C-alpha cells in the first residue's frame, strides 16, 4: 500500500483535488480523513468515487497518534488498497504526520512524496498569522499546488510561486492549474517516493507524551491556540 499525504489549511481545496486525482488516475484508493469540522462533510463529497475512512476524534499528528497508526494498519490489512490518501486536519504539522506514518512504514507500506495545497488568496495572511504551522506544511511537501488561482493574474501566481520556492527550493511548484496537467504528471504523484531528509518541524522541545490533558487554558491569539494543540 502506498500512502500519499495531501495537506493544506482549511478551505485550500484538498477534497476537490482528491476527487480530481481519483478521476484522472482511476486507481484503487482509500481516503483517511479527519477534520475539526462537522463529521462527514468532506467524506460525503468523496464517497461516490472512493472508500472513505473517517477519523474525527482530533488531529492525527497530535491527540490521536495511536488511533491514526492503528487505522492505517487496519486499512492496509483489511481493505488492502493500492493507495491510501491521508487528508490531515488543516491545523496540523505536516512533518509530524509524516513522522507518525514513517514509524509504521515497512515493506507493505510505502510513503510517497506529500502534496500541499496553498490558497493563493490566503497565502500572505496565513504565513504571517500561523507562522511555523504554515511554513512546516510548505517545507515538508514534495509538490506545492497553488489553489484557487484560476482568476488570478499570472504575475500574482508567479510571485506566490517565488515565495514558495524560497521556503522549499526542492519542491515541484507548477504554475499551471492541476486540472490542466498532463496524465503523466498525475501518474508521477503516485510513484514519487518521499524524500526522508526533508521532514522536520520548527517546533522543538515539547515532550514525547502518550497522553496529556488540560483542565482549562486561556490564549490571546489563534496561533497560540494552535501551538497548545500541537503540545497535546
Positions of predicted regions on the chain:
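Nucleotide-state-sensitive switch-loop elements of NTP-binding domains
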Residues: 2-125
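Short, hinge-like loop/turn segments at secondary-structure boundaries
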Residues: 47-51, 132-134, 190-193
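Conserved beta-strand/loop subsegment of P-loop NTPase cores
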Residues: 85, 109-118, 138-149, 166-178
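Residues at alpha-helix caps and immediate loop-helix transition turns in enzyme cores, especially N-
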Residues: 96-97, 129-130, 156-160
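Flexible active-site lid/hinge loop adjacent to a nucleotide/diphosphate
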Residues: 128-140
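C-terminal accessory "lid"/substrate-recognition subdomains
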Residues: 140, 152-232
Amino acid at each position: 500500500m502506498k500512502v500519499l499525504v495531501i495537506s493544506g489549511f482549511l478551505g485550500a481545496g484538498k477534497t476537490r483535488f482528491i476527487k480530481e486525482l481519483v478521476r484522472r488516475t482511476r486507481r484503487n484508493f482509500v481516503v483517511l480523513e479527519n477534520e475539526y469540522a462537522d463529521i462527514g462533510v468532506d467524506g460525503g463529497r468523496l464517497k461516490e468515487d472512493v472508500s472513505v475512512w473517517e477519523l474525527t476524534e482530533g488531529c492525527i499528528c497530535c491527540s490521536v497518534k495511536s488511533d491514526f497508526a492503528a487505522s492505517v494498519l487496519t486499512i492496509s490489512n483489511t481493505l488492502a488498497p493500492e493507495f491510501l490518501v491521508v487528508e490531515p486536519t488543516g491545523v496540523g504539522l505536516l512533518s509530524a504526520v509524516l513522522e507518525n506514518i514513517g514509524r509504521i512504514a515497512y515493506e507493505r507500506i510505502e510513503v510517497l512524496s506529500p502534496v500541499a495545497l496553498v490558497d493563493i488568496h490566503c497565502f500572505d495572511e496565513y504565513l504571517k498569522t500561523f507562522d511555523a504551522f504554515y511554513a512546516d506544511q510548505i517545507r515538508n511537501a514534495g509538490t506545492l499546488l497553488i489553489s484557487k488561482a484560476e482568476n488570478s493574474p499570472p504575475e500574482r501566481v508567479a510571485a506566490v510561486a517565488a515565495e514558495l520556492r524560497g521556503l522549499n527550493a526542492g519542491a515541484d511548484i507548477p504554475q499551471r492549474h492541476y486540472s490542466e496537467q498532463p496524465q503523466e504528471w498525475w501518474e508521477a504523484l503516485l510513484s514519487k517516493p518521499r524524500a526522508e531528509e526533508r521532514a522536520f518541524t520548527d517546533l522543538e522541545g515539547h515532550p514525547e507524551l502518550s497522553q496529556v490533558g488540560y483542565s482549562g487554558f486561556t490564549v490571546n491569539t489563534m496561533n497560540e491556540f494552535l501551538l497548545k494543540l500541537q503540545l497535546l
